[in-house]
Amino acid sequence: MNDKIELTDGNIIIRPCRLEDAAVICEGVQESMQEMLKWAPWCHPDYAISDCKSWLDSRHQMWSEGIEYDFVIFDPKGSTFLGGCAIDQINRKHNFANLGYWVRTSQEGKGVATAAVKLISRFGFETLGFTRLEIVAAVQNKASQRVAEKVGAVREGIHRNRHVVHDKIYDSVMYSLIPKQR
């Protein structure tokens, strides 16, 4: 993983996750637990710093092997943790991947996710060379759908039974971004 990667639009910074981010990520997850439990299968009521450290331990290898690219989102000074975004579920044969994001509860409604999606999609297209990025949001997750629409993603339809989160099955809206749309 390249620790030198740092993308910014002047309002936020996204950069690869680091082990030293564990405390602030865990704090953000715990603050946002009520919302995260609905949409994040990895989140659970007892989420602790040990969970975060275990996850972070695997990020370097995932990045190095081209399996997943996880970023943290910070304010422009790099001092306040705002959320996370990732390119994952990569399909090399057809050259596309999933793009996911979350913003801690105290930072919602400030354009953080929209800005992060713009930055990470540029990375996905220009650096990684993907020809398509997909944003999949549960039908009930209106906030994620708004972000997809704000960045110009095209709504392609409803995928039935697309998400399973804590044994609940959700239909999801499929959005796509392609390089020309940005």
For each feature predicted by the language model, list its residue ranges.
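Acyl-donor (CoA/ACP) binding surface of acyl/acetyltransferases
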Residues: M1-V24, G28-E35, D70-R182
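A short helix-loop-beta-strand connector motif used in the catalytic cores of GNAT acetyltransferases and
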Residues: C43-H44, D57-V72
